[in-house]
Amino acid sequence: MSKPQARLESVTVAAVQMTSAADVASNLQSAATLLEQAAAAGARVALLPENFSFMGRRDADKRAIAERDGSGLVQDFLSRRARELGIWIVAGTTPIADTPGERVAAACLVYDDQGGRVARYDKIHLFDVDIPGRAEKYRESANIAPGSRLGLVPTPAGLLGLSVCYDMRFPELYRPMAAAGAQWFTVPAAFTVPTGRAHWETLLRARAIENLCFVVAAAQWGQHESGRETYGDSIIVDYWGTVLARLGTGQGVILADLDLQAQRLARRDFPALSHRVM
């Protein structure tokens, strides 16, 4: 169990960009190296991308490597690295096998700096889409069971609202979290290249602006063993929609300071969240 978080004025957070493969052990080694870089650079909280531990050759492969909730290679790794590095880890998504039937949950697990798991959010909006003009078809719901609960967790950077990838297209997910006091949102993702070019930055900045929240988005990037290509462009945006940091291509880490005092003043002087009438 994590301790109550002291009120801080500015907190350094990191977003990790990866090109995950179909080998869990190799992906965890890459994640370990990048998390070490984030911690060494002063991050208090680090976000891993969606599917950080496994990008299989087929979507159905998630079922074969899914872990039971509470223990397993990936979950043990996350707890250990959070404790050893002394940082919080918001761990993209991990396939968890505790849903009815054969489908798994795409679970975003959060670990505090003592290695304790403090939150779980299951991806709600599933990507069942045919990409316009491309021979790309996605049916996440064939292998993933949707979540149904919001994810809110106190962190060193304030109250965090959890989301995953396709969730970002649904502003109604974020509004109740902002109304409940969320100060920042995380968006681990594995965006397609066409939709990334068209919408990625616009959607992230919109979610930040309309809720006066920071948004931290960690992405998959590059060519994967399935033949799929992901967009990358990990990004950190402030409550005013200003891009604080980004990594377009390649694997790596970006960092930014979340100025919570400036956010409080902005919300006081521009109280749009209190002006809602619908």
Q: What annotation goes with each model-predicted range?
A:
Residues M1-V45:
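N-terminal glycine-/serine-/threonine-rich phosphate-binding loop
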Residues P4-V13, L152-G161, W184:
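Beta-strand-turn-beta hairpins that frame and shape the catalytic cleft
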Residues Q17-T19, P49, D122, A219:
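Residue-level recognition of beta-strand->loop/alpha-helix junctions
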Residues V24, T33-Q114, V118-D122, F191-R207, ...:
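Cys-nucleophile CN-hydrolase/nitrilase-fold catalytic domain and related Cys-dependent amidase chemistry
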Residues G70-V90, L159, C165-I254:
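CN hydrolase (nitrilase-like) catalytic-core segments centered on the catalytic cysteine
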Residues A91-T93, A106-V110, G151-V153, S234-I236, ...:
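Short beta-strand scaffold segments in enzyme catalytic cores
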Residues T99-A180, V193-T202, D269-A272:
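Active-site catalytic loop in hydrolytic enzyme cores
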Residues Q261-M278:
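A short C-terminal boundary segment appended to hydrolase-like catalytic domains
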